[in-house]
């Protein structure tokens, strides 16, 4: 199986690579259209700001390439947020528009931002991305922006208010948390995605 991690120029490429390698796969980090389109599974990692990430995608000619993908794609953290229509960051940053929902700045509700640390994730019952993961398992988050709960939400978490922790739209999946930093539950989620 060809596993590709999209070279978005972001900082968590190596941690995602190592997490996939620990599961027995040999991922390739690439931004070459031919390699990306031939992938059986594709990871879209991202950390930092939506503006910087979209600039990187545009500079690397990846926007149309991502939208053309028909294989399963997993967006991680900012990679998931980029699947939405836009981010409220910096007055509004257009993103990929795969999921018809914006990403909004989290309201602090007296809690510190960014939301950083372990939080419980509640998936839709029986969803294949969460197969063999205990109900109410904890995953590791680092973010100040979040996608509201929407029709594509397959799991949610709460930090002052509910937000989308995972989503699915056609062949696109996204997780707001970092599975590569979430211990056994995160490893199982990556395994589930890779075995789809």
Swiss-Prot record:
Subcellular location: Cytoplasm
InterPro entries named among the record's database cross-references: Class_I_gatase-like, GATASE, Imidazole-glycPsynth_HisH
Catalysed reaction, written as an equation: 5-[(5-phospho-1-deoxy-D-ribulos-1-ylimino)methylamino]-1-(5-phospho-beta-D-ribosyl)imidazole-4-carboxamide + L-glutamine = D-erythro-1-(imidazol-4-yl)glycerol 3-phosphate + 5-amino-1-(5-phospho-beta-D-ribosyl)imidazole-4-carboxamide + L-glutamate + H(+); L-glutamine + H2O = L-glutamate + NH4(+)
GO CC terms in record: cytoplasm
Keywords: Amino-acid biosynthesis, Cytoplasm, Glutamine amidotransferase, Histidine biosynthesis, Hydrolase, Lyase
Presence of the UniProt keyword Cytoplasm in the record: yes
Xref: Pfam families: GATase
Pathway(s) it belongs to: Amino-acid biosynthesis; L-histidine biosynthesis; L-histidine from 5-phospho-alpha-D-ribose 1-diphosphate: step 5/9
GO molecular function terms attached to this record: glutaminase activity; imidazoleglycerol-phosphate synthase activity; lyase activity
Keyword Coiled coil: no
Disulfide bonds: none
EC number: 4.3.2.10, 3.5.1.2
Active site, per annotation: 77, 178, 180
Principal location class: cytoplasm
CDD domains in alphabetical order: GATase1_IGP_Synthase (cd01748)
GO biological process: L-histidine biosynthetic process
Glutamine amidotransferase type-1 domain sequence ranges: 2-196
Physiological role: IGPS catalyzes the conversion of PRFAR and glutamine to IGP, AICAR and glutamate. The HisH subunit catalyzes the hydrolysis of glutamine to glutamate and ammonia as part of the synthesis of IGP and AICAR. The resulting ammonia molecule is channeled to the active site of HisF.
Assembly mode: Heterodimer of HisH and HisF.
NCBIfam families found in the cross-reference section: IMP_synth_hisH
Protein name per UniProt: Imidazole glycerol phosphate synthase subunit HisH
